[in-house]
Amino acid sequence: RIFDLAMAFVGFGWLDGVPMQNRWEALLAGYESVNRLSDVERAAMPAMHRYATLSIGAWRYWKHVMREPDVEFADRYLEMVDRLEVQFDFSEAVQ
């Protein structure tokens, strides 16, 4: 469950290399309107976000460098690498 939530935030929660707190809050509020996160899931969000970011970065590398080399998209995985260095406090919205 929380991996999907983390993947959604990786895909839609960033703008120009910056995680957007309001997008995280909206995503979480929508999710929790249907299904509340457990305390264990809340605590795991930073690790799941990192895992989701790495997963997308690895997929982009495989797709655009190894499987179907494409000069235009070959460096897209680096966006995910850069995100790994950015700190984001999920606990501000995770209550």
Tell me what each language-model feature is.
Residues 20, 41-43, 70-73:
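Residue-level recognition of alpha-helical structural elements
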Residues 37-49:
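All-alpha amphipathic helical-bundle segments outside canonical DNA-binding/catalytic cores
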Residues 1-5, 10, 76-84:
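Gly/Ser/Thr-rich active-site loops/lids in small-molecule metabolic enzymes
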Residues 2-36, 52-67:
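Active-site activation/catalytic loop segments of kinase-like enzymes and analogous catalytic loops
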Residues 56-95:
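ATP/Mg2+ or Mg2+-diphosphate-binding catalytic cores
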